[in-house]
Design a protein with these regions (language model features):
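Interdomain hinge/linker elements that couple catalytic modules in large macromolecular machines
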Residues: 107, 111-277, 284-291
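A cross-kingdom feature that marks ATP-driven nucleic-acid transaction machinery
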Residues: 1-9, 216-220, 225-226, 230-367
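Conserved P-loop NTPase "ATPase switch" module shared by AAA+ and STAND
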Residues: 41-60
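Short regulatory helix/loop adjacent to the ATP-binding pocket of P-loop NTPases
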Residues: 83-98, 113-114
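Structural recognition of the conserved hydrophobic beta-strand(s) that form the central parallel beta-sheet
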Residues: 75-81, 100
Length: 367
């Protein structure tokens, strides 16, 4: 955003403040930075104020409201935890626009590697290169600093830092949790069981806490975008609420940083990656299960089920089972087409009057 502004705006009209910089000990960091900026540059036109990790500033929402109300020439850009949204809603009701920013998608990842895809034909010609980068993406994830870092030991250090920062700053500190060791243990449990169904009673026993406490901890983790839970689809809200949810992680790199074997979990990393991409594209994501058949992802728009997506890394061992589940789901929701995301199988099959598209993950993510 800043680079884009610099194309048409003088740098004297842009102020960036890193609010979690431990070297700065100002009582009112934001106003102090604005005052020093005015003294040094005396900006005459609109000033663009960027505030990073603003949640570290006490009573920041009051400061932002005051600037917004009294200074029409200042445009404010805030970045930080997802938890800011509710506080902004209180301070600036109806006067702000909110964007979720995720780690790089695979398309964005490829751009950083100077791999430019111009249509499906071009993609197929670059298949080997794209598959090579997909393996790196599955292992290290999409956080920009990790993607740009070449040293693997530094990548590991950064991933641990990100994981700890989200957990302690955005979950434990902001939520006032007084048993951080329980949250740390829960984090390890969730990351080792990602893509699986959650059993709150089992987790509660594992942590020696109540199921309600487990629910509260996971809720805080979801608010910080550390994990996402996906409910089972049902037209009955009660059934949705009583059935277990599936858990996914914000980034494969963070998930892998806890020390699990990459190759052993490749199928689940595929599923996590598919979820993250669907989460960028759609607002309502569920899984579906009925009579022993399960479909990984169900996409709903309004009152209508629009898509069913199955993930099957190894079609040779599980493809028939996944296909039968998908067909049953398509029958249930009167869908003519369904998709199975695979390791490297590409096909189009007609089954019982329905079309099943088999697409390898590297292709599905890139088009």
């Amino acid at each position: 955003t800043i680079n884009h502004l610099l194309e048409n705006t003088g740098k004297e009209n842009i102020l960036f403040v890193k609010c979690d910089d431990e070297r700065v000990e100002e009582d009112n960091l934001i106003e102090s930075a604005r005052e020093k900026h005015r003294e040094m540059f005396d900006p005459q036109d609109t000033t663009y104020l960027f505030l990073d990790e603003i949640q570290e500033i006490e009573d920041w929402n009051k400061t932002i409201k005051r600037i917004y109300d009294l200074d029409e020439k200042t445009k404010i850009f805030i970045s930080g935890s997802r938890l800011l949204k509710s506080e902004l809603s209180t301070a600036l009701a109806g006067r702000f626009v909110y964007f979720d920013v995720y780690p790089f998608s695979f398309k964005e990842f490829l751009k950083t590697k100077n791999v430019d895809i111009k249509g499906r034909t071009d993609l197929l010609s670059k298949k080997s290169n794209v598959k090579h980068h997909l393996r790196e993406y599955l292992q290290w994830g999409g956080f920009p600093e990790i993607v740009l870092e070449k040293d693997e030991e530094k990548k590991k250090e950064l991933l641990k830092f990100y994981s700890d920062s989200i957990l302690y700053r955005d979950v434990i500190k902001r939520s006032g949790i007084n048993k951080p060791e329980k949250v740390e243990k829960l984090k390890s449990y969730l990351l080792s069981n990602f893509t699986n169904l959650l059993n709150y009673n089992k987790i509660a026993k594992h942590l020696s806490v109540s199921p309600d406490t487990v629910s509260s901890y996971i809720h805080h983790m979801e608010e910080s975008y550390f994990v996402f839970s996906v409910p089972m689809f049902s037209y009955s809200i009660k059934k949705q609420q009583i059935n277990p949810k599936k858990i996914y992680c914000i980034d494969n790199g963070i998930r892998n940083s806890v020390g699990f074997k990459f190759s052993r979990d490749l199928g689940r990393l595929y599923e996590n990656t598919v979820f993250l991409e669907l989460n960028r594209r759609y607002d309502e994501i569920y899984y579906w299960r009925d009579n022993g058949k399960e479909v990984d992802f169900l996409i709903k728009e309004g009152d209508t089920v629009k898509k069913l997506v199955q993930v099957c890394y190894d079609v040779s061992s599980a493809g028939e089972r996944e296909e039968k589940s998908l067909i049953q789901g398509m029958d249930e929701f009167d869908l003519k087409e369904g998709t199975i995301i695979t390791g490297d199988t590409r096909d189009k099959l007609e089954r019982e009057g329905k079309t099943i598209h088999y697409l390898p993950l590297w292709e599905w993510l890139s088009v």
